[in-house]
């Protein structure tokens, strides 16, 4: 398994992955369709450069993705990250893809001195088991996960 940041050079593989994900699990997607030209434009648009998508690739295809943003609080300088999307194709689940995507993400967080990250958890039982396996993470009754990276 290799990891690549989403960019112009691998957008075709990413679009194939999105098509497959929408065919296999349309109820898991946040939209009923996606705009291929719009995605290509957003990758090139400086406004979207604060968004990072890391792709997990196997056999020359995308099998999973994590998307996140870094941000900072001006008042106290606390550096944070927000994970807004994690998805692994069904046939690649339970093989360490999501764990490795989070490992890549946490490596990027550490490189930028990120103090902690947040995500809104899926309430699906399978996803909940995955998030409960995180070490040093806080899970509230709300579907929010917070993990401190500066132990």
Each language-model region and where it sits:
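Conserved GNAT-fold acetyl-CoA-binding loop/helix
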Residues: 22-42
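A short beta-loop-alpha structural element at the N-terminal edge
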Residues: 1-16
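A conserved beta-turn-beta hairpin within the catalytic core of GNAT-like acetyltransferases
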Residues: 71-83, 93, 137-141
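Conserved acetyl-CoA-binding loop-helix of GNAT-fold acetyltransferases
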Residues: 88, 94-107, 133
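Conserved GNAT acetyl-CoA-binding A-motif
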Residues: 102, 109-122
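Terminal substrate-recognition subdomain of acyl/acetyltransferases
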Residues: 133-151
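Conserved beta-strand in the GNAT
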Residues: 53-55, 61-70, 82, 87
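Conserved beta-strand-loop-alpha-helix junction that forms the acyl-donor binding cleft
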Residues: 117-128, 146
